[in-house]
From Swiss-Prot:
The lineage of its organism: Bacteria, Bacillati, Bacillota, Bacilli, Lactobacillales. Belongs to the thiolase-like superfamily. HMG-CoA synthase family. GO terms for biological process: acetyl-CoA metabolic process; isoprenoid biosynthetic process. This is Hydroxymethylglutaryl-CoA synthase. Keywords: Acyltransferase, Isoprene biosynthesis, Transferase.
Amino acid sequence: MTIGIDKISFFVPPYYIDMTALAEARNVDPGKFHIGIGQDQMAVNPISQDIVTFAANAAEAILTKEDKEAIDMVIVGTESSIDESKAAAVVLHRLMGIQPFARSFEIKEACYGATAGLQLAKNHVALHPDKKVLVVAADIAKYGLNSGGEPTQGAGAVAMLVASEPRILALKEDNVMLTQDIYDFWRPTGHPYPMVDGPLSNETYIQSFAQVWDEHKKRTGLDFADYDALAFHIPYTKMGKKALLAKISDQTEAEQERILARYEESIIYSRRVGNLYTGSLYLGLISLLENATTLTAGNQIGLFSYGSGAVAEFFTGELVAGYQNHLQKETHLALLDNRTELSIAEYEAMFAETLDTDIDQTLEDELKYSISAINNTVRSYRN
């Protein structure tokens, strides 16, 4: 029996800014954003849209009535939680109409949370092959206007349905995990924006990949030649490339070109969205599968997950025969192409708005599953 990703999709808010416009507004060379960090556009959301909004829209795109009857676990990986006690997964469970006899909860460990959820889902299905698990990575990455992290913001969600005999990616049992207590990125309770040690975070990311890769190679004997593509956590698209370049310098030029060509296919969507935190690796996986022209059934895909603080994991998936028939490339391209571009003034005004849940209010938004009202601090969603 194989277990893995049976369905996968993503959702981003209907607004974005162009990175050239942001660079000009911040008196920065546009090349620093387009080339230096590798970003072209950045997703932006109004206060009427939160992680539940994104999670519900992403999940709705992949779930059938039969899926909702088979799902007995709903997991949301996030570091943008809307409540200190109640899990967004509980609200998502109701909005999706999933059968009631299910577990629903959140997982937090920076950008790693959804990977923890995916592995937990895999283990659950191994024990209950007739059941399915909905795993959603949903986040809003915000660092503040005019901050160093401003060009690496973003928002959205990735939804994955984990099942036995998956139709897209079968997960292997070769995981290598790494935990280190490092303050490279953190957000103390009550702080609206994270604290970031940029140089340390970059260094820890690169070092973490090197450690789990070397340990994985030691345990399995697998090297780059055994992988048809690698997908990385992508806080910005140059980050994964830095870690990759540090490890492939001893490979032949042809091998380096092969590996980097697949990497470029994995970052196409992220260049247009920005940082999805927990969803970044899986947005990269979707981009790889929907844009790579050389992948085929049986190919081995290596996945590197990283969450600051810091937890990292490397694991492998094998592409299933006919996987291309279960992707949603046209839908995803339409989602990205039909967004509204905001001027920098509009973006700054939207960014400056805050949702005061202590004030009863109604909110106007045409997007399905957006917040319709706040009553006694409780959020109501359109559906």
